Regions:
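Non-catalytic alpha-helical scaffolds and adjoining flexible linkers that form interface surfaces
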Residues: 1-28, 32-227
Length: 227
């Protein structure tokens, strides 16, 4: 988290992960930026005529100016909204998925300055706003969150150490953290190809892959288990 690093002023793009009312008119904000997570205070933001209020919203990309002094929090001295993903707030299911994404990013980025957290959050919000299948968004997000945390899912070798074969069926062995050969297994070449794709390319590319509802459900169940 950036607050522990000595600095004075920065300008950065960011998303609000969490906001908590503080004192009479202020808010403490958890922000994710390309430089990592920042905790900053927005003074007077809850006042009716606050200049900051309209520029700091959930599900929005904002250009922040932040001053760092002796306080444990940064101080937001300026903010300008760059993009608001308005379609998210029009749909309860989208809002629930977005809230899950924000919560997980907030936790995962606590002790990291990895720019990937900003990237995968942004792609998730763009996908939600654009109407990409919610199950595909969740599966892609969980796969990439795990990868960003340094926990790769084994999608290339089975429990016996052999390369996964296109003509074989597999089931997931939780204990071995790998696919095991299983004639009745629910995972074949098509499912594994999509999982590999999810862990290596952008969400918008995955969204173009043709997959029926049954396959999407199967992939999401798998990612929830391993994630």
């Amino acid at each position: 988290m950036l607050n522990s690093i000595a600095k004075k002023d920065i300008r950065t793009l960011g998303y609000v992960l969490r906001r908590v009312n503080y004192a009479e008119f202020d808010r403490i904000l958890n922000l994710i930026t390309p430089q990592g997570k920042i905790v900053a205070i927005a003074k007077g933001v809850r006042k009716e005529k606050s200049k900051l209020a309209g520029s700091i919203e959930m599900f929005s990309l904002t250009d922040f100016n932040i001053h760092f002094g002796r306080s444990e929090f940064g101080l937001i001295t300026g903010a300008k909204m760059q993009r608001h993903y308005g379609n998210i707030v029009k749909d309860l299911s989208k809002m629930e998925t977005a809230a899950m994404v924000l919560k997980k990013i907030d936790r995962a980025s606590e002790n990291s300055d990895n720019p990937e957290y900003f990237r995968i959050l942004e792609q998730g919000l763009i996908g939600l706003d654009a109407g990409i299948n919610l199950k595909i968004i969740e599966a892609w997000f969980l796969m990439n969150l795990k990868r960003t945390a340094g926990e790769e899912i084994n999608l290339y070798r089975s429990t016996d150490g052999e390369k996964l074969a296109e003509n074989m069926r597999y089931s997931w062995d939780v204990g071995e953290n790998a696919f095991a050969k299983d004639e009745r297994g629910e995972f074949g070449a098509n499912e594994i190809k999509i999982l590999r794709l999810m862990s290596t390319v952008d969400l918008k590319v995955v969204a173009r892959v043709k997959a029926d509802d049954e396959m999407v459900d199967k992939i999401l169940r798998f990612v929830r288990i391993v994630g």
